[in-house]
Amino acid sequence: MRLKKNDNVLVIAGKDKGKTGKVRYAFPRTDRVLVEGVNMIKRHSRARGQAKQAGIIEREAPLHVSNLMLLCSKCNKPARIGSRELADGKSVRYCKSCNEVID
């Protein structure tokens, strides 16, 4: 999976198409990520004593990575990303449009 925590992404498909946000959490096993303020769902919760009140809670649901594109920090555009090895053997991600190293 090429998206990591704290990456800025653009939603390219689905009900929130066109929205941007930051990746809060990645689920590599299922190829899904949580993006701040995107794909909001409502969950009804019961009261649990005095510690937790009943009500409708709005939270983010995971999105599949195929519906997202990384926003390149250098060219400020949604970009396809690839990986390459540097001379010291370290693997890094790079933007395929501007050819700049992302991390």
Swiss-Prot record:
<keyword id="KW-0689">Ribosomal protein</keyword>
<dbReference type="InterPro" id="IPR014722">
    <property type="entry name" value="Rib_uL2_dom2"/>
</dbReference>
<dbReference type="InterPro" id="IPR008991">
    <property type="entry name" value="Translation_prot_SH3-like_sf"/>
</dbReference>
<keyword id="KW-0694">RNA-binding</keyword>
<dbReference type="InterPro" id="IPR003256">
    <property type="entry name" value="Ribosomal_uL24"/>
</dbReference>
<dbReference type="GO" id="GO:0006412">
    <property type="term" value="P:translation"/>
</dbReference>
<dbReference type="GO" id="GO:1990904">
    <property type="term" value="C:ribonucleoprotein complex"/>
</dbReference>
<keyword id="KW-0687">Ribonucleoprotein</keyword>
<dbReference type="InterPro" id="IPR005825">
    <property type="entry name" value="Ribosomal_uL24_CS"/>
</dbReference>
<dbReference type="GO" id="GO:0005840">
    <property type="term" value="C:ribosome"/>
</dbReference>
<comment type="function">
    <text>One of the proteins that surrounds the polypeptide exit tunnel on the outside of the subunit.</text>
</comment>
<comment type="subunit">
    <text>Part of the 50S ribosomal subunit.</text>
</comment>
<dbReference type="Pfam" id="PF17136">
    <property type="entry name" value="ribosomal_L24"/>
</dbReference>
<protein>
    <recommendedName>
        <fullName>Large ribosomal subunit protein uL24</fullName>
    </recommendedName>
</protein>
<comment type="function">
    <text>One of two assembly initiator proteins, it binds directly to the 5'-end of the 23S rRNA, where it nucleates assembly of the 50S subunit.</text>
</comment>
<dbReference type="GO" id="GO:0019843">
    <property type="term" value="F:rRNA binding"/>
</dbReference>
<dbReference type="InterPro" id="IPR005824">
    <property type="entry name" value="KOW"/>
</dbReference>
<dbReference type="InterPro" id="IPR041988">
    <property type="entry name" value="Ribosomal_uL24_KOW"/>
</dbReference>
<dbReference type="GO" id="GO:0003735">
    <property type="term" value="F:structural constituent of ribosome"/>
</dbReference>
<dbReference type="Pfam" id="PF00467">
    <property type="entry name" value="KOW"/>
</dbReference>
<comment type="similarity">
    <text>Belongs to the universal ribosomal protein uL24 family.</text>
</comment>
<keyword id="KW-0699">rRNA-binding</keyword>
